[in-house]
Structure formats: structure tokens, C-alpha cells
Regions:
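Active-site loop segments of alpha/beta catalytic cores
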Residues: 1-168
Length: 168
């Protein structure tokens, strides 16, 4: 299968508006700046991302993966506006085209369950800080992928097998 990739609207906003500070935190006040109408920017991003996805589908993509690299930096009261709703709109677009969707809301930790239930993607990519047993027990509406910390590859063969078996 050919997987297409897109950045989620929030992640694109972080880069477009320079929201990420050197300390790794988000300057959320910029999203409230009157100079930017953040709601219009979000709406436009979703619109153009859907066009981009349609082009990827027409070029042969079988699956879409949405990377929300900076989702974990969204304050909890803003998750619905900046993470759940934009991803839901894109997921619904993909489903209308009969294309499965994998979402990666990186860094939202215990909010993975809320994301699964609100956005309803076909699959979710796990962060390596998500307990695989918790994920298997709770994220039952989606296919799961990923989750193992990249440093695991530097461990002994036995440790690598033990860690991999947690995900099987």
C-alpha cells in the first residue's frame, strides 16, 4: 500500500506562525493575535489539505497518515479547537473518499482515548510514552502502530524481543 502523509492543521500553524519558542513551549498568545484570524486560517488549511489529499489519492495513495507533531503542546482547553475538530474534518473527508486514515497526535498522552472517540480514525500511531498494554485495552476502535522507543534498537537482542513482544 502507498501511504500519503500530511501535517495536521495545528502542526502547520506552529510552523507558519512561529508559535514554538526556543524553550520548546508554545507562545499561545499568538493564536489570539487580532492580526491573524486563526479560525479563517484553520478553515483554509483544512480546505487546502483536503485538496492535497485528493491529489495524493489520485496519484495512487491507499492510506493517509496525519502527523500532528506538536499536538502535545496544545493547552488542554484548546485541544478540541486545534486538534480534535481539524483532524475530524480531514478524517471525514478521507472517509468520504473511501480512504483509511492513520492519525498521530503526538504528545497528547492520556488524551489518546478522547482523540480516538472524537476523531474516529481507522488507525493511530502511538507515541513511545504510551503504555502498549493500556493502548491495547483502551484504544479498541482503531488499528495501532508504532510506540516503541527508537533507542530500543540499541539494546541487546533479548531486550529488543522483550520490548517488541509488548506490542504484539
Amino acid at each position: 500500500s502507498l501511504i500519503s502523509f500530511i501535517g495536521a492543521p495545528w502542526t502547520l500553524l506552529v510552523y507558519m506562525l512561529g508559535l514554538k519558542e526556543n524553550n520548546g513551549k508554545i507562545n499561545f498568545s499568538k493564536t489570539k493575535n487580532k492580526k491573524f484570524n486563526i479560525n479563517i486560517i484553520l478553515k483554509d488549511l483544512i480546505y487546502y489539505l483536503c485538496i492535497h489529499i485528493e491529489n495524493q489519492i489520485n496519484a495512487g495513495a491507499d492510506v493517509v497518515q496525519i502527523f500532528d507533531t506538536w499536538a502535545g503542546l496544545i493547552p488542554e482547553p484548546e485541544l478540541e479547537k486545534f486538534c480534535y475538530n481539524p483532524n475530524l474534518q480531514i478524517v471525514n473527508f478521507c472517509k468520504s473518499k473511501k480512504i483509511p486514515v492513520i492519525c498521530f497526535p503526538k504528545g497528547i498522552k492520556e488524551k489518546y482515548l478522547d482523540f480516538q472517540n472524537m476523531v474516529e480514525p481507522n488507525g493511530m500511531n502511538l507515541d513511545y510514552d504510551i503504555d502498549p498494554l493500556w493502548a491495547k485495552e483502551n484504544l479498541t476502535k482503531v488499528a495501532l502502530q508504532g510506540g516503541m522507543h527508537p533507542k530500543t534498537l540499541l539494546k541487546s537482542k533479548e531486550e529488543l524481543y522483550d520490548e517488541a513482544n509488548k506490542y504484539l
